[in-house]
């Protein structure tokens, strides 16, 4: 079995990643853009940012964006490839304890890859608003856009340690839900498709905001690309 088939058939060996590789995310908003997580040979890949590294200034500085994308996100992609190679190697030799170790590492690294890839596309350099079907769903599930904003802010600012605030679509209940994810893979819900994510690891904000996570979250909420979120929502609801 080659690497591509191994990934496809294993759906990451049942690890606690948010989505299997071939789910709606990898078929998502732009097949040839940053949403493409895997190449034709089954290797995890990091596509280019959808904008230059000064695009988000002054909201997000160039140095933070460079370090975050190149080393933290990039490191997760390298880690996921290493993890998968080690899983295959130890499966072949029958060392199941090592398979367990590398499967847990893959859950961490691949979930990081998924969330970072969504995060970059969720951001723009101007204020936008949700509209049309997405706005109707927000109002149905949260009462109003303002209430959703307050809820996302609270969830993101209150993550214990490092993690993410996540707005996702739950196809089983046909509703939007908010998750408070620790690390990249803990406290998730099976089936939820992330459509908006906020990274609250310190590497996302410390150079500019120091220890003031709340200020960073408020800044991010001012530059969410709600058109991108709507695209992800419209893709996700097709699973109903």
Task: Indicate where each model-derived feature is located.
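N-terminal export signals
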Residues: 5-25
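C-terminal segment of N-terminal export signals and the immediately downstream linker at the start
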Residues: 21-58
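All-alpha RGS (Regulator of G-protein Signaling) helical domain and cognate RGS-like helical scaffolds
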Residues: 39, 71-74, 87-91, 96-169, ...
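Second-shell loop/turn segments in exported
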Residues: 62-66, 103-104, 225
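Structured secondary-structure scaffolds
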Residues: 63-81
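An amphipathic alpha-helical core segment
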Residues: 156-157, 161-210, 216-224
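N-terminal targeting pre-sequences for secretion and organelle import
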Residues: 215-240
């Amino acid at each position: 079995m080659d690497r591509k088939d191994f990934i496809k058939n294993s759906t990451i060996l049942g690890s606690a990643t948010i989505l299997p590789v071939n789910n709606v995310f990898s078929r998502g908003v732009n097949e040839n853009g940053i949403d493409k997580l895997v190449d034709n040979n089954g290797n995890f890949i990091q596509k280019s940012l959808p904008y230059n590294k000064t695009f988000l200034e002054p909201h997000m500085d160039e140095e933070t964006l460079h370090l975050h994308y190149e080393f933290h996100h990039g490191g997760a992609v390298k880690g996921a490839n290493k993890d998968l190679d080690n899983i295959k190697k130890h499966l072949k030799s029958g060392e199941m304890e090592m398979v367990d170790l590398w499967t847990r590492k893959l859950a961490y690294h691949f979930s990081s890859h998924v969330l970072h890839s969504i995060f970059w596309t969720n951001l723009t350099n101007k204020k936008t608003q949700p509209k049309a079907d997405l706005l109707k769903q927000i109002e149905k599930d949260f009462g109003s856009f303002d209430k959703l904003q307050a809820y996302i802010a609270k969830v993101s600012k209150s993550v214990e340690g490092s993690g993410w605030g996540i707005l996702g679509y739950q196809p089983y209940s046909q509703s939007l839900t908010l998750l408070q994810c620790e690390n990249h893979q803990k406290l998730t819900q099976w089936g939820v498709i992330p459509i908006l994510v906020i990274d609250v690891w310190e590497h996302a904000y410390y150079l500019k905001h120091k220890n003031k996570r709340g200020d960073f979250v408020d800044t991010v909420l001012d530059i969410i690309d709600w058109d991108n979120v709507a695209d992800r929502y419209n893709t996700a609801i097709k699973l109903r």
